[in-house]
Amino acid sequence: MSETLATDATAPAEKKDFIRQIVREDLASGKHTVIRTRFPPEPNGYLHIGHAKAICLDFGLAAEFGGLCNLRLDDTNPAKEDPEFVVAIQDDVRWLGYDWAQLRHASDYFQVYYLAAQKLIRDGHAFVCDLSAEQVRQYRGTLTEPGRNSPFRERSVEENLDLFARMRAGEFPDGARTLRAKIDMASGNINLRDPALYRIKHVEHQNTGNAWPIYPMYDFAHSLGDAVEGITHSLCTLEFEDHRPLYDWCVDKVDLVGHPELLQPLLDKGLPREAAKPRQIEFSRLNINYTVMSKRKLTALVEEQLVDGWDDPRMYTLQGLRRRGYTPAAMRLFVDRVGISKQNSLIDFSVLEGCLREDLDAAAPRRMAVIDPLKLVLTNLPEGHTETLQFSNHPKDDSFGTREVPFARELWIEREDFAEVPPKGWKRLVPGGEIRLRGAGIARVDEVIKNADGEIVELRGWLDPESRPGMEGANRKVKGTIHWVSAAHAVEAEIRLYDRLFSVEKPDDESEGKTYRDYLNPESKRNVRGYVEPSAAMAAPEQAFQFERTGYFVADRRDHSEATPVFNRSVTLRDTWAK
């Protein structure tokens, strides 16, 4: 992909968070002339809603200040990575409305990392250690006790270079040796107690095959990857704040800017020389109630078949939210509403749902659909009577135009819109009572037909011929208006009624001896057969609608077709979880 300046027409003119203030100051002082950011996910799973905040910040910041944002796949742990995730990550970023200046992989820089590690050894800043993982833990110390130096810490430069070369050659088994930074085993920051920089893993890599039996650790690869790409502002969540001293140590001790020879492998590949010193800045991660976002727990939900896959519309993956009917505009609005700060907080799920309602209220055309059908026969219309009515596609926006809706003697209405014995304040159909049929006139129920079990199976009634749209009688006041579809023309559809996956605000809370599995909401998915007007059935996958009086729905991106329509409820018209 060519390197072009990021643009984002949807970005607000001015945002005031502390990160943008830093960027403004850096540009004003001349410290930087072009802002460079990156989004660096590991391709070991599907992105979730928490990643949306990072994507919108990394790409949005670059766009806002006319800069560049790379997508870098942090593929340094090949045992857990898969090309399926690589494709999904790119799909998610584009879906949110962003594009990258360059698509890079940490594996593009493996030779640079190796040369950098050799430099650290020559400079006396790294050593090969033979301690096992368990021994390293024992030597590390605790938060209140300093660690102890490895017995291998004082190996000579020559011995370390030889051992590291033999690690590279594949001579040793997994776990036999590591390359460790030589920093300070008494540091109050445990991340600085001689952390590992390289480990031995004889695992085939999706990009480099079996070329490398050693792989760099995250902190080493991440910091140098930023430096290689000339990233000016490396944005990450607060849990990496304690890692920043190690990040800076790696950048400063390797000093790619002062040692351009380390970059020669990139130049040999035709990649540009862009090295610069990056600055890491931390912000609060996105935490939302009624969700879990641990990759381990999301994986368990899928593998234990507690959900229907990574793109199950109840999942908080971006693929799941997209299939549920969440829109890129709603996701970006949500990130804006949440804001950027250094204070961790728990965001109410209703904020996310509210952003979707706000977007779809403006963007979704209206249609009629009946989810729990009950037949209403208008007996004063002749057998076989049909006509075509004109309906607005959006009551607030004439640019959406109009559509034709068939109307007939026999209709489907919602079962819940009729009450044989109405509760107090009831404003819908009752025996002998009148109701306005949306866009068609005023109807009355004269007869209730039941089956042998006493269940209502049909209503028979009358349509006031003087109350048709445009007639004087249409102005007559009645208590309520209901929607309908023509029984002769409506298309049967599968309608999936989705709700929150968990029934409690904090499903991660295990204080009562329960786990998130115990808090799964049994009402989070209900499949029903309903009827939709013909123009809804003809919709393309991912087309969103407001089904009038019912909620916002989307044509399923996987299963929907004109012949077999499938609609997912994205969100109810109102917050049904409000306390």
Swiss-Prot record:
Belongs to the class-I aminoacyl-tRNA synthetase family. Keywords: Aminoacyl-tRNA synthetase, ATP-binding, Cytoplasm, Ligase, Nucleotide-binding, Protein biosynthesis. InterPro entries: aa-tRNA-synth_I_CS (IPR001412), Gln-tRNA-synth (IPR004514), Gln/Glu-tRNA_Ligase (IPR050132), Gln_tRNA_ligase_bac (IPR022861), Glu/Gln-tRNA-synth (IPR000924), Glu/Gln-tRNA-synth_Ib_cat-dom (IPR020058), Glu/Gln-tRNA-synth_Ib_codon-bd (IPR020059), Glu_tRNA_lig_a-bdl (IPR020061). It catalyses: tRNA(Gln) + L-glutamine + ATP = L-glutaminyl-tRNA(Gln) + AMP + diphosphate. L-glutamine binds at D74, Y218. It comes from the Bacteria. One of its GO terms (molecular function) is ATP binding. Monomer. A motif ('KMSKS' region) lies at residues 292-296. ATP binds at residues 42-44, 48-54, 237, 285-286, 293-295. Signal peptide: none annotated. Pfam families: tRNA-synt_1c, tRNA-synt_1c_C, tRNA-synt_1c_C2. Its EC number is 6.1.1.18. It comes from Xanthomonas axonopodis pv. citri (strain 306). A motif ('HIGH' region) lies at residues 41-51. It is found in: Cytoplasm. It is an enzyme of class 6 (ligase). This is Glutamine--tRNA ligase.
